[in-house]
Amino acid sequence: MSSPSKRREMDLMKLMMSDYKVEMINDGMQEFFVEFSGPKDSIYEGGVWKIRVELPDAYPYKSPSVGFITKIYHPNVDEMSGSVCLDVINQTWSPMFDLVNVFETFLPQLLLYPNPSDPLNGEAAALMMRDRPTYEQRVKEYCEKYAKPRADTEEMSSDDEMSEDEYASDGDDEDDVAIAGKLDP
């Protein structure tokens, strides 16, 4: 195993052993999803985003590619593709950093200190500079609409499944029989 390959494996294991939920995309160790929570005491607090990470062949000498799968309203994140302004990580990346640094330092810094002068989302950048309270409200609306904590979304889906099961097997069956009886000639 080559040195970059060993390093990739070690960094990925370290990330998996941390508090972050990691979901591999393929059998390899190059692409995966990570759940990332908004920094405390920020307008992003309470939000949980699914982040796609791609490790280049030259990792750790070249920075990972990071993109938001979950929608986020931020000047340095493209709203449609989820791409993060590459300068955020590339300019400061060093092989001394690892994947945990991306989620404990780089992304929190990105959310805490947006740079509206180098935007990927021009609308968010303009709103942030023109009307900060409205910008912050929009961020919170996106958090509420798209970045609900995973536990809440799991509960909602299991409730939805339960209501479908109830519809198919419980009291609604009696209604179905009654309706079917009324419709028969």
Swiss-Prot record:
Annotated Pfam families: UQ_con (PF00179)
Renumbered to this chain, the Acidic residues biased-composition regions fall at 154-177
The annotated region (Disordered) lies at: 146-185
Checking PROSITE patterns in the record gives: UBC_1 (PS00183), UBC_2 (PS50127)
GO BP term (any one): protein ubiquitination
| Functional summary from the UniProt entry | Accepts the ubiquitin from the E1 complex and catalyzes its covalent attachment to other proteins.
This chain's protein is named Ubiquitin-conjugating enzyme E2 5
